[in-house]
């Protein structure tokens, strides 16, 4: 077994922003995003910075806490992806109990527990990826070194549009640097 180091993306200034934006808008499935990144030698965050704000917009880092509490209050089902290079855990369902404690944001559900140290969130992005069923909207969280911490989506079934409630909850988040 031979291990290979992860490919290092090129600096974003070498990428063609118009081409990346055009390719993003042409997607018909969220999974095509991985191919877009590979084709243009980009990290997720580099791609986010290259496209229009309607596709990727940086939001304040308190977005996770706000979104989880709103989803809990409304009871709509969400998906939370947390992973690393070797493993991904996916939660799908309604968030039942959110407990902030000593800098940690905790979710306590009967079948899912998450403990996230809020100060480790360096960047938070709302992204919209086109699919054959309309846009799929997510909140993506990153550490200072660019490592992805988590992705959140409204629960949806392939072939169905995104929850309008989820979209409204995401749209309520404040873009970074703008007053609420």
Question: Whereabouts are the PLM-identified features?
Answer:
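Mixed-charge (acidic/basic) macromolecular-recognition segments
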Residues: 1-54, 159, 170-180
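Alpha-helix initiation/capping motif
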Residues: 16, 43-44, 59-60, 117, ...
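Long, positively charged binding patches that form subdomain-scale interaction surfaces
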Residues: 38-103, 107-108
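C-terminal functional regions that serve as terminal interaction/effector modules
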Residues: 80-88, 93-95, 99-180
């Amino acid at each position: 077994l031979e291990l290979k180091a992860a490919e290092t993306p090129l600096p974003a200034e070498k990428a063609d922003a118009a081409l990346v934006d055009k390719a993003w808008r042409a997607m018909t499935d969220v999974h095509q995003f991985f191919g877009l990144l590979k084709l243009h030698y980009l990290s997720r965050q580099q791609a986010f910075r290259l496209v229009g704000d309607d596709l990727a917009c940086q939001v304040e880092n308190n977005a996770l806490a706000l979104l989880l509490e709103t989803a809990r209050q409304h009871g709509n089902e969400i998906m939370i992806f947390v992973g690393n290079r070797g493993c991904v855990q996916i939660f799908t369902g309604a968030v039942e109990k959110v407990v902030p404690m000593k800098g940690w944001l905790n979710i306590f559900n009967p079948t899912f527990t998450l403990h996230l140290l809020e100060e480790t969130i360096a960047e938070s992005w709302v992204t919209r990826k086109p699919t054959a069923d309309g846009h799929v909207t997510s909140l993506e969280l990153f550490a200072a070194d660019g490592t992805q911490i988590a992705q959140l989506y409204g629960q949806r079934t392939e072939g169905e549009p995104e929850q309008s409630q989820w979209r409204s909850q995401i749209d309520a988040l404040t873009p970074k640097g703008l007053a609420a």
